[in-house]
Amino acid sequence: MKLNKIYLLSFRNLEKIELTPAHRFNIFYGKNAQGKTNLLESIFLLGTMKSFKMAKNSEMVRWGSDQSLIKGWVERDGVTREIALFIDKQGKKIKLDRKSVTKVDEFFGNLNVVVFTPEEINMVRGVPDLRRKYLDRAVFSSDVTYLHAYHDYCKILKNRNILLKSGEKSGLDVWTEKLAEYGRKVINKRLDYLHEIQELLSKFYNDISGTEEVVEIRYRPHLMDMENYEKDNCGALSEALVKCAAEEQRRGTTLVGPHRDDIDFVLNGRALKQFGSQGQQRSYVLALKMSEIDCLHQKFDSPPILLLDDMTSELDQDRNRNLMEFLKKKEMQVFITTTSLQNISLEGIENHRTFLVSEGKVLH
């Protein structure tokens, strides 16, 4: 999978950009706040219809314009498809080969992207919601049915919470049963993904860090024993909901389910959040991204595109070198931002392009 060409119009501070990237490495360099990250964001949007900055639609439209346009020509297995994303204050519209797309299934898998930004480290240090969002996005990227299961669960959760807040008990059992049913679907798909990446995560972490450490990732259900869930996932969630019934009615909200669960990042048997150094935490997050890349490669028989934002400022010299050596061995397209080309080792890479980004313009 390769992005052969990208065209931007009125996206953030980028007025009009047309690029023909290299099929391997593309480096956007220049001073801060010039538009480098915006270029990566546009590619991510083209693949996911979402911003990794969690921005409002209006914030992505250039000042003075009514609409942004992001257009890309993506090649896979010798076939090129045109993807166009239109953004305005009301929302987003997607076209595939100039035909409007209304279902996510039609859009899914046409441009697979994985992003690493400096903010990703907050996944380790921050609140559980950040880790859940990472996991949900990773699972959905390789399994479109997960999004349907997740949305169904969220609708049921919303209705159940309305009933709990009202204090009305009539009909609550029905919503509780549905919540357990769809909650199991969400949790099981999350667990399947974590089991799939466990060995990959360990391998990639040690490749990047140049060490031999014990790397684990564990799912931690809220107010529910993981061992019991794995033995009897049909009954464990329902049982936990029964135990919390009185407290839920008192608080007026659902206390158990995948919307409350967390993930533990573990290194050498200890919590990475409390005991890991910054270098270890960054290596772990990068290893998560590399694992995601491998899963997507296996799923679609084609590697995704990797976006690395300001990578060199986040890794020490040894980890940076190990990462670049690792990426050189992977047959995938990579887009990197940096403040200086001196931070990136392009030795031995024949297929690459560098682009100077200054004041919203790209100089070839």
From Swiss-Prot:
Keywords: ATP-binding, Cytoplasm, DNA damage, DNA repair, DNA replication, DNA-binding, Nucleotide-binding, SOS response. Disulfide bonds: none annotated. The keyword ATP-binding applies. GO terms for biological process: DNA replication; DNA synthesis involved in DNA repair; double-strand break repair; SOS response. It comes from the Bacteria. It is found in: Cytoplasm. It holds the Pfam family SMC_N. ATP binds at G30, K31, N32, A33, Q34, G35, K36, T37. InterPro entries: DNA-binding_RecF (IPR001238), P-loop_NTPase (IPR027417), RecF/RecN/SMC_N (IPR003395), RecF_2 (IPR042174). One of its GO terms (molecular function) is ATP binding. GO terms for cellular component: cytoplasm. Its main location: cytoplasm. Belongs to the RecF family. The RecF protein is involved in DNA metabolism; it is required for DNA replication and normal SOS inducibility. RecF binds preferentially to single-stranded, linear DNA. It also seems to bind ATP. This is DNA replication and repair protein RecF. It comes from Geotalea uraniireducens (strain Rf4) (Geobacter uraniireducens). The lineage of its organism: Bacteria, Pseudomonadati, Thermodesulfobacteriota, Desulfuromonadia, Geobacterales. The gene is recF.
